[in-house]
Amino acid sequence: MVNPTVFFDITADGEPLGRVCFELFADKVPKTAENFRALSTGEKGFGYKGSSFHRIIPGFMCQGGDFTRHNGTGGKSIYGEKFEDENFILKHTGPGILSMANAGPNTNGSQFFICTAKTEWLDGKHVVFGKVKEGMSIVEAMERFGSRNGKTSKKITISDCGQL
């Protein structure tokens, strides 16, 4: 089985930054990977297209995936509001790691973050389910619009997304 690849086309205040491609680790975390894949294609009638990265902290991570409230309090999974932590096999080993944001144990929805550093303190708390395959320079460009409190200086949006 080949792990799926999905893409995000990113804009900053409507100006194209470029494309980020992710490999989703369906071989290790099939349920979590499938959620992100289906939210990227929009095949269930809702998903990431048009949503933004509401929290970007340089040297830490870029967080997005709240397509219902757009502020970090919303989002939902393809399995309903929330789903359980699948496993913690994969670790936050460095830049480019894709992991689920949550509000405590077993509260996965649609919010995720892309690490821009090694974040080992998140191991065992957040489910790692993918990595940046291409376009890490785009993630670094996104990071430049972040701040220490996470507020972005430009609106960083997923203008298009899907499966490759």
UniProtKB/Swiss-Prot annotation:
Which SUPFAM superfamilies would you find in this protein's record?
Answer: Cyclophilin-like
Activity regulation comment: Binds cyclosporin A (CsA). CsA mediates some of its effects via an inhibitory action on PPIase.
GO-annotated biological processes: activation of protein kinase B activity; apoptotic process; cell adhesion molecule production; cellular response to oxidative stress; endothelial cell activation; leukocyte chemotaxis; lipid droplet organization; negative regulation of calcineurin-mediated signaling
Q: Name one GO molecular function term.
A: cyclosporin A binding
Chief localisation class: cytoplasm
- Chain positions with Phosphoserine modification: S77
Q: Where is this cross-link: Glycyl lysine isopeptide (Lys-Gly) (interchain with G-Cter in ubiquitin)?
A: K28
Q: Which GO terms describe its cellular component?
A: cytoplasm; cytosol; extracellular region; extracellular space; nucleus; protein-containing complex
* Entry keywords, A to Z: Acetylation, Apoptosis, Cytoplasm, Glycoprotein, Isomerase, Isopeptide bond, Nucleus, Phosphoprotein, Rotamase, Secreted, Ubl conjugation
Q: Which residues are glycosylated?
A: N108
> Using the chain's own numbering, where are the disulfide bonds?
none
Sites bearing N-acetylvaline, chain numbering: V2
Q: Which family does it belong to?
A: Belongs to the cyclophilin-type PPIase family. PPIase A subfamily.
| Reported function | Catalyzes the cis-trans isomerization of proline imidic peptide bonds in oligopeptides. Exerts a strong chemotactic effect on leukocytes partly through activation of one of its membrane receptors BSG/CD147, initiating a signaling cascade that culminates in MAPK/ERK activation. Activates endothelial cells (ECs) in a proinflammatory manner by stimulating activation of NF-kappa-B and ERK, JNK and p38 MAP-kinases and by inducing expression of adhesion molecules including SELE and VCAM1.
Name the chain's protein.
Peptidyl-prolyl cis-trans isomerase A
